[in-house]
């Protein structure tokens, strides 16, 4: 990570604080509008109150090519309920008011429709810290690179085991805040066994930068959170939290507290 990346990052202080506590950050994802807008916003503030360090606010999209079945079902329900991009910004504002840190996770098309600079402006105004863009590569991100600089937002790009050394280095150099390491190939979703490719991918990023690395796509338990927290800077959980929310807010709260305990036991056997 360059000096510029470190100084400009809105999430940098959070990762510094977690490092000082010798633990990984817990990063939780929920889609806006599931099961309805108000409940989804309440659920996201529950994540904050239950120990989630960063909340990924999902923008439902009609063609979610990288999402597993759990998240696809939730986003379809949200879209059927009429969720809008503006609702995601409302969620960001609520998370910020609750003392949390929010990043938006969205496919690129909704941002283009909204207007790239306008979206960055409104996200920053809502208290957002940055944007995760799973289907946008830095080579095609000139508008977003400019808008994120203009409005002081972190930009979180994805790397995968299939990333070539050149692509990985370019992606890491363009990222700010953290890099999202997809620990399994293909779509996301909770799995019983976390991919063995994840430690290797984190090591590849660490070989070219000291930017924080978040690992996602598979975590569902306290034990898995602890396992990933031993080598990653952030443990990303999505599908398991969406499933828990389907069982109600108490279930979501319980799982989040378990995961928060998991990232804090990274040095335990």
UniProtKB/Swiss-Prot annotation:
Top-rank taxon, per record: Bacteria
GO CC terms, sorted: cytosol
InterPro entries: Aldolase_TIM (IPR013785), RibuloseP-bd_barrel (IPR011060), Trp_synthase_alpha_AS (IPR018204), Trp_synthase_suA (IPR002028)
GO molecular function, one term: tryptophan synthase activity
Catalytic activity entry: (1S,2R)-1-C-(indol-3-yl)glycerol 3-phosphate + L-serine = D-glyceraldehyde 3-phosphate + L-tryptophan + H2O
Family matches, as CDD domains: Tryptophan_synthase_alpha
Keywords: Amino-acid biosynthesis, Aromatic amino acid biosynthesis, Lyase, Tryptophan biosynthesis
EC numbers, comma separated: 4.2.1.20
SUPFAM superfamilies: Ribulose-phoshate binding barrel (SSF51366)
Pathway: Amino-acid biosynthesis; L-tryptophan biosynthesis; L-tryptophan from chorismate: step 5/5
Active-site residues, as the UniProt record annotates them: 56, 67
Family: Belongs to the TrpA family.
Function: The alpha subunit is responsible for the aldol cleavage of indoleglycerol phosphate to indole and glyceraldehyde 3-phosphate.
Quaternary data: Tetramer of two alpha and two beta chains.
Name listed for the protein in its UniProt record: Tryptophan synthase alpha chain
The species this protein was found in: Mycobacterium marinum (strain ATCC BAA-535 / M)
């Amino acid at each position: 990570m360059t000096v510029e990346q470190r100084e400009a990052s809105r999430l940098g202080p959070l990762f510094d604080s977690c490092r000082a506590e010798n633990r990984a950050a817990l990063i939780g994802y929920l889609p806006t509008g599931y099961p309805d807008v108000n409940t989804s916003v309440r659920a996201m503030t529950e994540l904050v109150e239950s120990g989630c360090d960063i909340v990924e606010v999902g923008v439902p999209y009609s063609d979610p090519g990288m999402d597993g079945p759990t998240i696809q079902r939730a986003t379809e329900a949200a879209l059927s309920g009429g969720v809008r991009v503006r609702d995601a910004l409302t969620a960001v504002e609520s998370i910020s008011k609750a003392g949390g840190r929010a990043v938006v996770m969205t496919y690129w098309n909704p941002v283009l429709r909204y207007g790239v600079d306008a979206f960055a402006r409104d996200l920053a105004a809502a208290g957002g810290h940055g944007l995760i863009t799973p289907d946008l590569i830095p080579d095609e991100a000139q508008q977003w690179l400019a808008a994120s600089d203009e409005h002081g937002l972190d930009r979180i790009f994805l790397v995968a085991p299939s990333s070539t050394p050149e692509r990985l280095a370019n992606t890491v150099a363009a990222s700010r805040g953290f890099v999202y390491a997809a620990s399994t190939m293909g779509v996301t979703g909770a799995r019983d066994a976390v991919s063995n490719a994840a430690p290797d991918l984190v090591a590849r990023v660490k070989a070219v930068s000291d930017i924080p690395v978040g690992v996602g796509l598979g975590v569902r338990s306290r034990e898995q959170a602890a396992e990933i927290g031993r080598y990653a800077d952030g443990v990303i959980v999505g599908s398991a939290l969406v499933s828990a929310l389907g069982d109600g807010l108490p279930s979501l709260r319980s799982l989040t507290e378990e995961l928060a305990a998991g990232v804090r036991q990274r040095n335990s056997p």
